């Protein structure tokens, strides 16, 4: 699933959706917040911690997608791609939709 994303909140045309503001350089849920275009409100995402280091590279706004909840856990799949080659995936889950530093993580790598 590819979600709409913008480098500036001023480029967002969908005023009804909630947007996730994330640092372009970030780590494990740091500095993640939610943004509502219709009223200009921005609020911290549950599970996110703030680090001044990740404020430096700028932010991206991505349309929020509700993750499924399985027995109180929110799973997420991340991928590693080098050039145009898929190299692995990581399965991560946490008690909040924003995965943090202590979330469960299982890496997988691809071998030919």
Regions found by a protein language model. Name each.
Residues 28-30, 39-43, 53-59, 65-112:
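ATP-dependent carboxylate activation and anion-phosphoryl transfer catalytic cores
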Residues 1-60:
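Active-site nucleotide/adenylate-binding loops and adjacent lid/helix of ATP-dependent enzymes
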């Amino acid at each position: 699933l590819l979600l709409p994303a913008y480098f500036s909140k001023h480029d967002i045309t969908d005023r009804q959706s909630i947007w996730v503001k994330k640092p372009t350089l970030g780590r494990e849920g740091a500095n993640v917040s939610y943004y509502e275009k219709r009223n200009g409100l921005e609020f911290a995402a549950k599970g996110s911690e703030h680090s001044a280091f990740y404020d430096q590279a700028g932010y991206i706004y991505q349309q929020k997608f509700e993750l499924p909840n399985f027995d109180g856990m929110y799973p997420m799949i991340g991928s590693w791609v080098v050039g145009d080659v898929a190299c692995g995936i990581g399965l991560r889950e946490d008690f909040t939709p924003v995965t943090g530093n202590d979330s469960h993580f299982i890496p997988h790598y691809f071998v030919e």
